[in-house]
Amino acid sequence: MPEDLAKQLASYKAQLQQVEAALSGNGENEDLLKLKKDLQEVIELTKDLLSTQPSETLASSDNFASTQPTHSWKVGDKCMAIWSEDGQCYEAEIEEIDEENGTAAITFAGYGNAEVTPLLNLKPVEEGRKAKEDSGNKPMSKKEMIAQQREYKKKKALKKAQRIKELEQEREDQKVKWQQFNNRAYSKNKKGQVKRSIFASPESVTGKVGVGTCGIADKPMTQYQDTSKYNVRHLMPQ
């Protein structure tokens, strides 16, 4: 993942340089100005994502999570989960499970708040309630605080990734306009040169349509010597 982001970042920077070079000769072009702004934004978002990539597995809390999943979860299950905003445990429902990344999208019951949280941080309702009662209002441990901070950063990174996706779509929409701009610039540099079709009407009455595509369309057709005397019968053995 970090390697992919690094490649994308390099690509965005190269595109930004091209746009800035184009703006140096056409600083009032709205399409180019919009493209420059989008590229600058996506570059900053990608940098932020690179800086928030986790270097190790999310640490579990002392009283709430274990190092290995102890429950087989499925969509629709009720569970107890930690809310990243206050680090407290609340009842929630699993909306979606990402087995590859070991995460689940949950919605807190009675609140409607949605979050993406590691499966390791989920507990069955009864077990979670007991852990919450046992802990009471005890301050969060250092591991819990680290887990909360990382979860917050992860949630923020997901939003940034979504924004990058939106900007990518906008850039795709701008690609046609960008190509049109390049075509117009090329046409201006070639001003005075007329590109003729091979099917264009010749200027002289002796010219032939579609003949002489190398700049000789107005010249008469090449005359060939009559070779009818070389009949096949002359080639047959006597």
Curated annotation (Swiss-Prot):
> What InterPro entries does the entry give?
SMN_Tudor, Tudor
Renumbered to this chain, motif Nuclear localization signal spans: 142-160
- The Tudor domain covers 72-132
Q: Where in the cell is it found?
A: Nucleus speckle; Nucleus, Cajal body
Keyword tags: Acetylation, Apoptosis, mRNA processing, mRNA splicing, Nucleus, Phosphoprotein, Spliceosome
Matching entries from CDD domains are given as:
Tudor_SPF30
Q: Which Pfam families match?
A: SMN_Tudor (PF06003)
GO cellular component annotations, sorted alphabetically? Answer: Cajal body; cytoplasm; nuclear speck; nucleus; spliceosomal complex
Purpose of the protein: Involved in spliceosome assembly.
Quaternary structure and partners: Associates with spliceosomes. Associates with U4/U5/U6 tri-snRNP and with U2 snRNP.
Q: What is known of its domains?
A: The Tudor domain mediates association with dimethylarginines, which are common in snRNP proteins.
Q: What is this protein called?
A: Survival of motor neuron-related-splicing factor 30
List the taxonomic lineage: Eukaryota, Metazoa, Chordata, Craniata, Vertebrata
